């Protein structure tokens, strides 16, 4: 088992947004170990809302087997939903290594990560 985190996304943009997850490397998914990163793939977040509610969706890095020496990582893309489709707003690459999560945001996407405690928290905000 690897280091886990509770993650949520807050939409402070005037328009609704849609999220896409890709580039998943060494992260449990689809309920493995309780981690469900796929929850965010295709998720629509209404303006001025946070998804999911509560403490967030649990995600967990894989820290065994082939992944023991590899950085766990994924990319979260954020698109604004427009009348003509979608417009990219930015993205954030989230990575975990040695029980610490890190972020690399672009565009209108920010992330605040707290690595203290048994589980990290990852709060992504779109402006």
Explain the meaning of each model-derived region.
Residues 1-127:
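Intrinsically disordered, low-complexity segments enriched in small/polar residues
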């Amino acid at each position: 088992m690897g280091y886990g985190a509770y993650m949520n996304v807050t939409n402070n943009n005037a328009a609704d947004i849609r999220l896409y997850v890709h580039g998943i490397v060494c992260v449990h998914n689809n309920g493995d170990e309780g981690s469900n990163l796929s929850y965010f793939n295709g998720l629509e977040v209404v303006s001025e809302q946070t998804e999911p509610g509560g403490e967030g969706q649990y995600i967990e890095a894989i820290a065994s087997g082939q992944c023991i020496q590899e950085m766990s990582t994924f990319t979260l893309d954020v698109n604004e939903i427009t009348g003509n489709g979608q417009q990219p707003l930015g993205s954030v690459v989230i990575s975990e290594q040695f029980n610490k999560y890190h972020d690399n945001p672009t565009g209108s996407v920010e992330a605040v990560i707290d690595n203290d405690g048994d589980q990290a928290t990852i709060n992504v905000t779109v402006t």
